[in-house]
Design a protein with these regions (language model features):
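Eukaryotic helical DNA- and histone-tail-recognition domains of regulatory proteins
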Residues: 1-37, 49-68
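Amphipathic alpha-helical protein-protein interaction segments
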Residues: 15-22, 39, 93, 97-104
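Alpha-helical protein-interaction modules
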Residues: 34, 47-140
Length: 140
């Protein structure tokens, strides 16, 4: 999905701090979406889509963490025995999560990289910038 690619492209300290994208990042993302697809999405529409993707990702992630659930990378969907789904369905507030019982979510891995990566730490040393990310150091 092009939006996810743009979000990942802007997932750098100059455009994103404290888990939020900057105004410049959003402006760039909206402009590039509108240019690529010859549309006129508003900033609010694009932000809402990002929030919808984030909510869906968190819902699936929470289910993957539940006992008895797993993630099928090939089919890009949750898997669990019927008894696990039945037990889960009996709980309160499970309606949104049950949505994923028979649906794939092809954006799960890409969104995991976007929302679950460790916090970026940037240090400026002798005119060099170092990004510390998931135990890797990248010098620019």
């Amino acid at each position: 999905m092009f939006l996810i690619d743009l979000l990942k492209e802007h997932d750098v300290p100059v455009f994103r701090t404290h888990n939020a994208w900057s105004k410049d990042a959003w402006t760039n993302i909206v402009n590039r979406l509108n240019t690529k697809f010859n549309t006129s999405f508003s900033l609010g529409q694009v932000k809402q889509k990002e929030q919808d993707l984030k909510k869906a990702y968190r819902s699936v992630k929470d289910l993957v963490a539940e006992s008895g659930f797993g993630w099928d990378k090939e089919r890009m969907m949750l898997h669990a025995p019927p008894s696990v789904w039945a037990s889960f369905a009996a709980r309160e507030n499970s309606k949104d999560a049950l949505h994923w019982q028979d649906r794939s979510f092809p954006y799960y891995d890409a969104l995991a990289q976007l929302y679950d990566s460790e916090t970026h730490i940037v240090l400026s040393i002798s005119d060099s910038v170092f990004f510390f990310f998931e135990n890797m150091v990248i010098k620019f």
